[in-house]
Structures are given as structure tokens and as C-alpha cells.
């Protein structure tokens, strides 16, 4: 893939990419990035892990998600911008 390639022109570089959203609380989300608005980050087909503060639980959740795909619990989810600590591509979490 070309660096800086935008999946859909006029959208963010992450548009359509499966991402991991780490929050300032105990939640972790994995879903397809759509956009960020004043309301927050909009994801589609979202898996959610509560109590993600436990590193072993988080790593296991991400390992299984990477291996078997996103088990969507939400069709759409908006994570408020103030609760977003970091957004990264799911492929960056591949340890295998």
C-alpha cells in the first residue's frame, strides 16, 4: 500500500481501516474507522472490551480479534473525543 493513500478521497487516511481505540478509561474498541467529528470517533462493526486496564486481558482480546476477526457487538459506536487516548491500526498489534 502506498504511504498516504486515502481509501476514499475526501476522508481521513484511516477511513475504512480496522482500528483499535484505546480510551482514557477501562474500555477498548476495535472497529472500522469512519470519521472523527465534534461528537467523537465513529466506528462501524465494533467489538468492545471493558476493563481493558488489565494488560493480559487486552492482549488476549486483541490477539483473538486479529486471528479470528472482529466480533461486532455494535453496528456503530461513537467514542467521545475526550475519552480517546490513542487510535492505531489493528495490524500494528500483530505479535505473531
Feature names for model-found ranges:
Residues 2-96:
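Conserved RNA-binding domains used in RNP assembly and mRNA/RNA metabolism
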Amino acid at each position: 500500500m502506498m504511504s498516504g493513500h486515502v481509501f476514499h478521497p475526501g476522508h481521513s487516511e484511516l477511513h475504512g481501516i480496522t482500528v483499535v481505540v484505546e480510551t482514557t478509561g477501562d474500555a477498548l474498541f476495535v472497529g472500522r474507522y469512519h470519521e472523527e467529528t465534534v461528537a467523537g470517533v465513529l466506528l462501524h462493526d465494533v467489538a468492545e472490551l471493558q476493563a481493558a486496564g488489565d494488560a493480559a486481558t487486552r492482549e488476549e482480546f486483541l490477539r483473538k480479534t486479529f486471528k479470528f476477526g472482529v466480533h461486532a457487538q455494535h453496528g456503530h459506536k461513537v467514542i467521545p473525543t475526550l475519552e480517546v487516548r490513542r487510535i492505531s491500526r489493528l495490524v500494528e498489534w500483530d505479535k505473531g
